[in-house]
Amino acid sequence: MPYEVPQHIATNKVFIVNFSELEGRLEPEFYRPSIASLENHIRSLSSHKLRDYALSIAGGATPPKTETAKYYTDSESGIPFLRVQNLQTNGELSLNDCVYINEDTHNGLLKRSQVAEDDLLVKITGVGRMAIASVAPKGFVGNTNQHMVVIKTGDTELSKYLAHYLNLDIIERIASRHSTGGTRPALDYPSLKSIPIIEDIDFSLIDKALKEKKEKEEKACELLDNIDYYLLSVLGIKMPTSKSQTLQDRVFTVNYNKISGGRLDPKLYSTSIVQLMQSLFMSPYDKQPLKDFIIRSCSGDWGKDESEEVNENKYTKCLVIRATEFDNTYNLHLDNSRVKYRWIENSKLSKMNIHANDLLIEKSGGSEDQPVGRISILTDEILKENRIAYSNFIHKITVEGINPMYLYFYLKTMHNIKITDSMQSQTNGIRNLIMAEYFNQTIVVPPLPKQQEIVDYIASIRQQAKALQEEGKYILEQAKKEVEQMIIDQ
């Protein structure tokens, strides 16, 4: 007699699997009827598996960050070292926030995971979406870590077809179904290779949507790229004219009395930095050091892992903001699956004394091509959604006597034009902000009504750009849904 679910239990939350149907895995999610029937349907339509299109599959590794000088370098002389964040569901690689390795590492330690044009790159490890796929563009030379694989297909159009296919939500659900592991899910090679592939799907709808999305993103970028120019112009700050970068142009001299007792860092005294600093004083508005506006200042804390047992009367679980959450374009990126929740001691939370309009400064981190010192602001919306703390790599300031949002936009521009680059030191591959110099930097201070005018204008530009990006994202999502529905209806 078949088992019947008791009436007091919602039947839509319960499903029954016969013992004979168990496939060696005991996670309930694997046997959920909706995903099981979806996979059965996809397999019934497919005649091939991913392995049938792969000439070779290889994974990489991550060279030790403790030996930065041995393995890594800058973008000018280095080879792109791809990570999961460089993969996109539109099938294209993003080289923003890219790390670079030297040629010896590329041709030695990581020779087996070299990436060439038209190779298919697929995510196999990590939280969030599984099997994100991107195609290496024409002329590309790169490498990758262990969290994705390089699949050589030998054919450009085939790689693009497979990327479109793997980036469909219904196929991602199948890939995620076969991943294992709790805190860091992984898709092993046998499971990856056995992903069913349906041939001859018409992806023209997605191609058209991608083109429209790209056009909207380009318009958004134009708007965002003009923000720094607008802010500098309205403050009367004229950027120094760029000169050629010959060796002779980069050589400069400094009087000994200027460096006596100070730090021997050529960046601090370089002609470009000196000219940038001088340009601030050309503004007709008042100037004050940042420290004049700071009324509270506090370092962060990393706390304890959320899996640890703690006395909940003495600790609070918080979303701990790290440098990873700093968005180079907007503010903080907290709506992803990579955020960290940790236990923070209540006494330390009290010292942090977090309020809306507090500014967070990245004091340690950065990369070869990205100075440390990025800035973010805690808005009412952020504080309403989560109990917030911040890591020991972040420093918080509370200001008065100046519009906090204006100060946020101003400091963001100062970072973008590389003034912050002169306020840091570097040890073991990690950049550290020299806080005393950062707090002593010059702030151009127009009257409060002018500050608000600047804030309103920049906020409106960012809003327009965000709307364009969201429109592009929606167009692509709808196209994918149409293609997926055509597959399901077969």
Task: Identify the function of each model-found stretch.
Residues 170-173, 262, 283, 415-418:
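Short glycine-centered helix-capping/turn motifs at secondary-structure transition points
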Residues 48-71, 85-117, 288-310, 324-359:
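Sequence-specific dsDNA recognition surfaces
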Residues 124, 149-184, 189-226, 405, ...:
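Ordered, small/hydrophobic-rich secondary-structure cores
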Residues 78, 97, 145-147, 317, ...:
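A generic structural signal for short beta-strands and their flanking turns/coil linkers
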Residues 88, 127, 201, 366, ...:
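Flexible, active-site-proximal loop/turn residues at the rims of small-molecule/cofactor binding pockets
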Residues 141-149, 160, 180-203, 384-395, ...:
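A short glycine-rich beta-alpha junction/loop motif
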Residues 1-68, 194, 199-306, 440, ...:
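Non-catalytic DNA-recognition/assembly elements of restriction-modification systems
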Residues 83, 104-106, 110-113, 117-166, ...:
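A short beta-sheet element
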